């Protein structure tokens, strides 16, 4: 399975970066300001008595955040630093935070807007935490940041307009410290930084192919180039494309996935080390701690530790590994009896599962023998160990891992996906029977936790006097209403770039949308009519 590849000599010449209309993004001088940018002295909205609706000091931590709002007219997005709005986007704009994948920190944000004088009728700019423009570019650009290198990607232009569905365009790499553009090989449309190497996916459209026709041999017309920052190429793979390892990319920062076409409908997935040249075929996925799984020639599966010198084999399986946490692997088997199994790496015991669900830090497994367990993904510690009393003729289950050892279960005794019983379990066993909520709410979703770590939920119900409208109630772990009548509410994942405090969610109440705590206090809010492009359309946010 292991192959060591021949590396291209350092004397090879790479193509120079072309800052032209067809294959690059021309840097423009900084603009004078951001249209629609908020003043540093933004006023806090007040209630009828003149009392501020929120204390801006609560979120005054200097971190970039983004508040998304949606309504019938489309989307509107606000970029904030701490609790200070920097920019409220028009509906024709695209704005987003730019996270450095190496640090997980976002110190910049990107904005693109309509401009008839720009390439494809669009322009793009990068801004810092103060709202000051750092760089601007022709065209509609997407951006990623990797170890201080800004990677820009632009869709293909045809007759002055973008054709994003073609899947190929151009890319550019800029060193933010110096503003210098790094060499990019001809045909490059994406770039991934692996260690000190740049991995480019490239494509050449066949001559004579109509601009709007699909390239039926696109797999054969792609290739991958790995090169040094100075442009020296060190490796090339034909009929291939490269993909960053999005999960556990810090531990395996020198590795990249290569998909190499071996036939008209067959592809080899390869885990490639840009520093050593090692290649492992049959690659499936990576797991925490630098582990990876592979398929073998005899139809089995291997789990290997890619951080060790010999890439040590941990275990071999008959079924495909789905998830890993210390001491265990979740496997998936297909066919008529498809489903999950919990594999004990120490004993080799396999336990059939009804369902499995993972949060950022825990993984919950509900076994067909009735046992319900929640483990820590960090160390494999057992957080919850209880037994579920099944409903009569139980056929399936819907499970939601609420974190901290809590699990929401919907038990079904039919094949129509109708729920028979709804229960909440935790470290102490059964917490509450919430079956009665089924008659009141069209659906109930996990929202956040209360200050004691117990889960809270958001239930959607019909608004009084409305045939189609809905309102939302916030419920505690016992199903009691804590907040009612919200126009919207939605949770945030703990790994969100917004980095909000605990026990906070996005909500709309009345004519304001923003972030609220479980006591109903705003941490930040803005009028749903505050955007110049809102057209007086009600919105909801997250």
Model-derived regions: residue spans:
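Bacterial N-terminal signal peptides that target proteins for export
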Residues: 2-13
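C-terminal motif of bacterial Sec signal peptides marking the signal peptidase cleavage site
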Residues: 20-24
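Bacterial lipoprotein signal-peptidase II cleavage site
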Residues: 26-34
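Residue-level detector of conserved, function-critical positions
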Residues: 33-542
């Amino acid at each position: 399975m292991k192959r060591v590849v021949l590396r291209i000599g350092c004397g090879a010449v790479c193509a120079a970066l072309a800052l032209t209309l067809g294959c690059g993004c021309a840097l423009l001088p900084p603009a004078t300001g951001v249209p629609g940018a908020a003043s540093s002295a933004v006023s806090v909205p007040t209630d009828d008595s003149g009392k501020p609706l929120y204390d801006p000091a609560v979120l005054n931590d200097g971190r970039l955040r983004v508040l998304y709002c949606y309504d019938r007219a489309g989307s509107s997005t606000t970029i904030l630093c701490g609790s200070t709005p920097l920019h409220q986007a028009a509906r024709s704009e695209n704005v987003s935070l730019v996270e450095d994948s190496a640090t997980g920190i976002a110190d910049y944000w990107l904005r693109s807007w309509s401009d008839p004088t720009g390439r494809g009728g669009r322009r793009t700019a990068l801004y810092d935490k103060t709202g000051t423009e750092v760089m601007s570019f022709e065209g509609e650009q997407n951006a990623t940041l990797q170890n201080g290198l800004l990677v820009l990607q632009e869709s293909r232009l045809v007759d002055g307009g973008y054709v994003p569905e073609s899947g190929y365009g151009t890319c550019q790499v800029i060193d933010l410290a110096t503003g210098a553009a790094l060499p990019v090989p001809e045909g490059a449309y994406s770039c991934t930084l692996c260690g000190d190497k740049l991995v480019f996916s490239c494509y050449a459209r066949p001559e004579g192919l109509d601009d709007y026709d699909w390239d039926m041999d696109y797999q054969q017309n792609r290739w991958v180039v790995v090169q040094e920052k100075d442009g020296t190429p060190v490796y090339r793979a034909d009929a291939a494309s490269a993909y960053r390892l999005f999960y556990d990319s810090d531990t395996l920062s020198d590795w990249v996935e290569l998909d190499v076409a071996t036939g008209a409908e067959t592809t080899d997935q390869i885990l490639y080390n840009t520093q050593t040249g090692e290649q492992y075929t049959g690659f499936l996925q990576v797991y925490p701690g630098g582990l990876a799984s592979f398929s073998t020639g005899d139809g089995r599966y291997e789990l290997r530790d890619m951080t060790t010198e010999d890439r040590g084999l941990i275990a071999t399986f008959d079924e495909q590994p789905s998830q890993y946490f210390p001491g265990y692997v979740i496997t998936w088997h297909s066919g008529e009896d498809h489903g999950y199994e919990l594999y004990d790496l120490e004993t080799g015991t396999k336990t059939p599962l009804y369902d499995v669900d993972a949060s950022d830090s825990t993984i919950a497994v509900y076994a067909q023998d009735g046992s319900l367990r929640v483990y820590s993904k960090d160390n494999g510690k057992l957080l919850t160990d209880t037994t579920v009393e099944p409903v009569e003729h139980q056929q399936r289950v819907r499970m939601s891992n609420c974190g901290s050892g809590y699990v929401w279960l919907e038990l079904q005794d039919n094949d129509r996906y109708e729920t028979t019983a709804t229960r909440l379990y935790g470290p102490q066993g059964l917490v509450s029977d919430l079956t009665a909520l089924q008659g009141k709410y069209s659906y109930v979703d996990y929202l956040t936790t209360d200050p004691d770590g117990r889960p809270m939920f958001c239930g959607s119900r019909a608004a009084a006097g409305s045939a189609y409208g809905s309102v939302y109630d916030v419920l505690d772990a016992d199903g009691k209403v804590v907040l009612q009548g919200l126009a919207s509410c939605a949770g945030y994942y703990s790994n969100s770039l917004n980095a909000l405090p605990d026990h906070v969610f996005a909500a709309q109440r009345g004519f304001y949308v923003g972030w609220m705590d479980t006591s109903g206090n705003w941490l930040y809010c803005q009028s749903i009519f505050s955007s110049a492009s809102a057209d007086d359309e009600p919105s909801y946010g997250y």
